[in-house]
């Protein structure tokens, strides 16, 4: 009897080979090679406080004040302005000292191997670096600031290379918001005339967020900010901000440069310009021409750059702000040059509760939008809600979010009636 054929063996199940996930390497175009190899810097380059101190000692304030500002500026030793809590002419500050710059670079440990760079042939002092420093095109003052730093760093060590790159204003802002810029020059136009509006943006707010400041350092700054803004006694606030000044000096998240004494210039036949430090550029409403003007019908104004946005909920740059403040009406507006006195606009009156927590604005009757609809309190409330929903550190909405949602011991309720 023929033998029955053997039953076929079932194929052995095999698992498909597991491929290791490929880690995507995202290079920053402004960091050269993105390595500590003399042709770039790693993304952690400025983590080292000695590197930050070295850069501070390499700047030359005298050159900027004497040759660029023609004497119409003073060195900024702290972030707040004269007359504000925290302003202290005796605060510790950095100054131009190329020997100290070299000392700090030799103390750095950029490759994080525990050996100071001055004793490590694979660290920044021997390897050198190449990095791009950015400014907004057309701002020659910021360009020269970068050139001063570039020249001094090259004098300290010929292997230190800073390439200066100018970007159009909107692109400059976009690069900041993308947290791509390793080192840049910037400034601040205050939102409110208060020390908090100078200390917050450079640490926990706009600039602090854009520069990837470590969370532990931001936490230290925030504790002092919350304490300072919750106090009403100027002397008590001053003591808190003095601690802030010391922390900022010790950790060097930025280098305070100069405070211009701010002169305004216009043609002799232009009158009515108001110099208020909170204005975004020029407030056109008060400006007029005398009979001496050759063309009484036109007004030409030079701004710092192209507009970024005309949405008042998102705009947080001077160029856009100048246009917005001249085409939109606000509830109240500043009274001339005063930073603490106001005149009615869309709100015909307002009251404040005894504890300062509740502010009630009475909306002017008969105001119409350009398309013909009436302005109502609901429209005003919508503007607040819309802004807060779109907020972020690159918009002005933190000015509302902090008091509305709580900072320190604040508890403010918005009433619309």
Model-derived regions: residue spans:
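Aromatic- and charge-enriched surface segment that lines or borders ligand/interaction sites
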Residues: 45-47, 348-399
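Append "and occasionally in soluble cytosolic enzymes with long acidic Gly/Pro-rich linkers
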Residues: 21-33, 40-155, 218-220, 243, ...
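Short helix-initiation/N-cap motifs at beta->coil->alpha
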Residues: 163-174
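Short, well-ordered beta-strand elements
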Residues: 127-137, 162-165, 295-306, 358-361, ...
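Detector for C-terminal structural segments
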Residues: 54-89, 141-151, 173-309, 315-327, ...
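N-terminal lobe/hinge region of extracytoplasmic solute-binding protein
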Residues: 302-354, 385
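Surface-exposed binding/hinge segments that line
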Residues: 396-417
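Ser/Thr-rich, Proline-interspersed low-complexity disordered segments
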Residues: 1-26
